Design a protein with these regions (language model features):
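ATP-binding N-terminal substructure of ATP-dependent carboxylate-amine bond-forming enzymes
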Residues: 1-94
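Active-site nucleotide/adenylate-binding loops and adjacent lid/helix of ATP-dependent enzymes
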Residues: 4-5, 99-183, 211, 235, ...
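Solvent-exposed alpha-helices and their adjacent loops that cap or buttress functional pockets
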Residues: 21, 37-39, 90, 112-114, ...
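Internal nucleotide-binding/catalytic subdomain
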Residues: 155-294
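Short, conserved charged micro-motifs
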Residues: 161-164, 340-343, 388-395
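Active-site "cap" helix and flanking loop/linker of ATP-utilizing ligase/carboxylase catalytic domains
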Residues: 246-268, 286-356, 369
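Generic C-terminus detector
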Residues: 369-370, 375-422
């Protein structure tokens, strides 16, 4: 059986790596992949990204199942195209992916279906947005409506920051079409968590909880990024909160999408804010697994990922069960110089470990160049390790990080600090 994974990041490397554990899988193709998937003897990179080319490849190679990693192909309708061609694919349709591709769509959906979220207003006119922010005060959150690779959210702690974010998106067009409409939300306080599930249109299977670290620098300082590290499980999601999230957020979302005539299949990721008194609100939806959360989650998943996806595609997730490694997994992202601004590319990476036990280095922004692994993107690697405690997993991951070198490498030294402290 052949499997195709679409994408080139650390998330896709982790998904492909987990798929190779299935003995019936003869080949895992990754399109377009990265240096990590190129080096792995169980994977083959395919240099294609266009939807039509992916469909043709899946037909020609008789791909049994396709897994979509990133948001962009989903919003381009890759699932619709594969289904039309009679091909098995795991992910939401273009219409369902609006939960992520349009913040305004997601907010209106949540209000309509009574799903707890922050109060908000949407603007296309810069003057009206400025007036609203002046009236509301800071701190306040400015979000680009469209997909902006994790960089479309500004948590403005001052009015000056809020006005600058509005100007960047609406007046200066810094994010292009993604920022032509902005959603302005109330600032929520508490602890964030990532809550991911698999959905088959009706049935829901919860995956392990996790917590991401969005800011570039230690102690959650510096600019927002796509994520600088993550760990699983997230102790902040207690059994009580888990049940509450399923009852008040996940179930109403899946039922609401079906009610709206847009049944949802695929991974669904709710970004949560958990207040000190146990209130939970939805910050955002993503229509795919998180990156870097996927890496620690896949390290802990003991069940067969292919079998779970087969159930999801066939509408039988109610028959599926998951088994998890009881240990913690923690991943540290190593990023290029200048990230999250325009990253420096082409630096050789040395010190990559050959063999690891209870740990794995997942590649993201890497390519093979004359047999050398070099940087090719903002987030370069996610060094992920298992441990009996968060502290031990953290120590194991950082031991490996310390061995890996490339010019200008950036990484946080405190991934998992909340759980270690807690």
């Amino acid at each position: 059986m052949k499997i195709l994974v679409i994408g080139s990041g650390g998330r896709e490397h982790a998904l492909a790596w987990k798929v190779t554990h299935n003995k019936e899988v003869s080949r895992v193709y990754v399109a377009p992949g990265n240096a990590g998937t190129a080096i792995d003897p169980d994977m083959v990179n395919v240099p294609i990204t266009a939807v039509d080319d992916l469909v043709k490849f899946a037909q020609d190679e008789q791909i049994h199942l396709t897994i979509v990693g990133p948001e962009a192909p989903l919003s381009q309708g890759v699932v619709d195209a594969f289904r039309k061609a009679g091909l098995k694919i795991f992910g939401p349709t273009k219409a369902a992916a609006q939960l992520e591709s349009s913040k305004d769509f997601a907010k209106a959906f949540m209000v309509r279906h009574n799903i707890p979220t922050a109060a908000y207003a949407t603007f296309t006119d810069a003057k009206l947005a400025h007036d609203y922010v002046t009236q509301q005060g800071a701190p306040i959150v400015i979000k680009a409506d469209g997909l902006a690779a994790g960089k479309g959210v500004v948590v403005a702690m001052t009015l000056d920051e809020a006005h600058a974010a509005i100007d960047a998106m609406l007046a200066d067009n810094k994010l292009g079409a993604a920022g032509a409409r902005v959603v302005i939300e109330e600032f929520l306080q508490g602890e964030e968590a990532s809550f991911m599930v698999m959905v088959d249109g009706k049935n829901i299977l919860a995956l392990a909880t996790s917590q991401d670290h969005k800011r570039l620098l230690d102690a959650d300082l510096g600019p927002n990024t796509g994520g600088m590290g993550a760990y699983s499980p997230a102790p902040v999601v207690t059994p009580t909160i888990h049940a509450k999230v399923m009852r008040e957020i996940i179930k109403p979302t899946v039922e609401g999408m079906a009610k709206d005539g847009i049944p949802y299949t695929g991974f669904l990721y709710a970004g949560l804010m958990i207040s000190p008194n146990g209130d939970v609100k939805t910050l955002e939806f993503n229509c795919r697994m998180g990156d870097p959360e996927t890496q620690p989650i896949m390290m802990r998943l003991k069940s067969d990922l292919v079998a779970l996806m087969e159930h999801a595609v066939d509408g039988t997730l109610d028959r599926a069960e998951t088994e998890w490694d009881r240990r913690f997994a923690l991943g540290v992202v190593m990023a290029s110089a200048n990230y999250p601004d325009t990253p420096r590319l082409g630096d050789e990476i040395v010190g990559l470990p050959k063999q690891l036990t209870d740990a794995h280095v997942f590649h993201a922004g890497t390519v093979l160049n004359n047999g050398k692994v070099v940087t090719s993107g903002g987030r370069v690697l996610c060094v992920t390790a298992l441990g009996e405690t968060v502290k031990f997993a953290q120590q194991q991951a950082y031991k490996i990080v310390d061995e890996i070198k490339f010019n200008g490498a950036q990484f946080r030294t405190d991934i998992g600090y909340r759980a270690v402290k807690g």
